[in-house]
UniProtKB/Swiss-Prot annotation:
High-level lineage: Archaea, Methanobacteriati, Methanobacteriota, Methanomada group, Methanococci
CC terms in the record's Gene Ontology section: ribonucleoprotein complex; ribosome
Protein known as: Large ribosomal subunit protein uL16
Homology family: Belongs to the universal ribosomal protein uL16 family.
Pfam families (alphabetical): Ribosomal_L16 (PF00252)
Species of origin: Methanococcus aeolicus (strain ATCC BAA-1280 / DSM 17508 / OCM 812 / Nankai-3)
The gene coding this protein: rpl10e
One GO MF term attached to the UniProt entry: structural constituent of ribosome
UniProt cross-references to SUPFAM superfamilies, sorted A to Z: Ribosomal protein L16p/L10e
Amino acid sequence: MALRPSKCYREINKPAYTRKKYIRAVPQPKVVHYVNGNKGGDFPVEVHLVVKDDIQIRHNALESARIVGNKYTQNKCGRLGYKFQIRVYPHQVLRENKMASGAGADRISDGMRLSFGKAVGTAARVRKGQKIITISTTPENVIHAKEALRRCNMKMPVKCKIVIGKGAELVKN
């Protein structure tokens, strides 16, 4: 069955459901690497992508943002000129009670009986002001880090802002 739209899971309107003991099979998150680039490098400047609202971000949105941001940063800064880090983990289990529609659906569907639903994915719960992605780099590459985070922002289901954390005094506006 097709993937439901993100708006179905965006709001935080239920308690966190991270208990995997009662669920038969939870799909693995699509995010494969949480740290990219020069993992051991010590860079003087950090640029963050900060969320403006409380929201759930699905694992496939995090992965697509990682791919876009990492590829752009790697092309502009080189393989060892940056450190790209996703700072949230998708713990929240997303469930879907599939409903049959069409001819004969009443004979197939259970309706609201046993409506716990099957696990269809995971999401990260983030709060307003939380940093979700950080790029550490040199002062010369800050403009590229900002552009990479702007591209990551386009993949997110929420408005975000780009903030320079550590090393703001080294960066020329």
